[in-house]
């Protein structure tokens, strides 16, 4: 996102926190392909050619592996790959054996994502989910608090970030691989919008994100039954009511 308040924050939410990733090598060409496809569609231009794809066409069809590093670019496009992102997230969650860590700003997960998280908890995986205490929008965060509390009841560990608005969309699995991208864990991202994520199979990169998560815990409140009840009855009602609309949020 590009705007002044993404850099300077907003008075009602404080500092804006986000997560970006720099990718080098053949995996970039998939990002280039997605960008040019949308650019050409909107501008009616036909930009392309070998100069934009120096690694060749093969790089678009396979995730490259170099010295133990693997990057897969997953795109969700409504008419091309409508289920790709949902399937990628569910597969990642289902693969977890020890730990899942999620940071997501508009956390109103679809029923299939919630079921995958609950199954992970039931098989002994520690699931840690970080959501922002403040948001740049209304209604959706109330549903997010309600749904996060429901997952807390199932055994997930919920952290409410207090250091501003955490707009990051990341997930780490077993400290083995991670994903960083534009995808929110809500119906809009998984069913309607254009989204793109990098799934990075790399221990050092995943360790960096894990360290950031651990540091952010120090600036977070652990959601407990008592903490959730501190929300006003009206806020709790709005959360319950809002969650009924999660299929379109």
Residue ranges, per PLM feature:
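Charged, low-complexity intrinsically disordered terminal segments
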Residues: 1-249
């Amino acid at each position: 996102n590009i705007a002044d308040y993404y850099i300077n924050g907003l008075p009602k939410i404080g500092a804006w926190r986000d997560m970006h990733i720099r990718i080098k090598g053949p995996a970039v060409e998939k990002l280039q392909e997605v960008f040019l496809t949308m650019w050409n569609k909107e501008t009616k231009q036909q930009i392309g050619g070998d100069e934009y794809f120096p690694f060749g066409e093969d790089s678009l069809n396979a995730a490259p592996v170099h010295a133990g590093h693997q990057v897969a670019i997953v795109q969700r496009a409504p008419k091309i790959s409508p289920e790709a992102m949902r399937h990628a997230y569910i597969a990642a969650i289902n693969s977890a054996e020890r730990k899942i860590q999620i940071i997501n700003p508009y956390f109103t997960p679809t029923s299939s994502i919630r079921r995958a998280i609950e199954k992970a908890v039931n098989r002994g995986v520690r699931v840690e989910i970080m959501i922002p205490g403040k948001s740049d929008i209304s209604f959706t965060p109330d549903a997010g608090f309600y749904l996060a509390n429901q997952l807390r009841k199932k055994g997930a560990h919920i952290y409410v970030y207090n250091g501003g608005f955490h707009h990051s969309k990341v997930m780490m699995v077993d400290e083995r691989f991670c994903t960083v991208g534009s995808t929110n864990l809500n119906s809009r991202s998984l069913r309607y919008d254009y989204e793109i994520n990098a799934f990075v199979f790399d221990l050092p990169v995943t360790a960096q994100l894990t360290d950031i998560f651990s540091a952010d815990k120090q600036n977070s409140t652990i959601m407990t039954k008592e903490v959730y009840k501190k929300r006003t009855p009206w806020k709790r009602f709005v959360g319950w009511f809002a969650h009924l609309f999660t299929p379109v949020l």
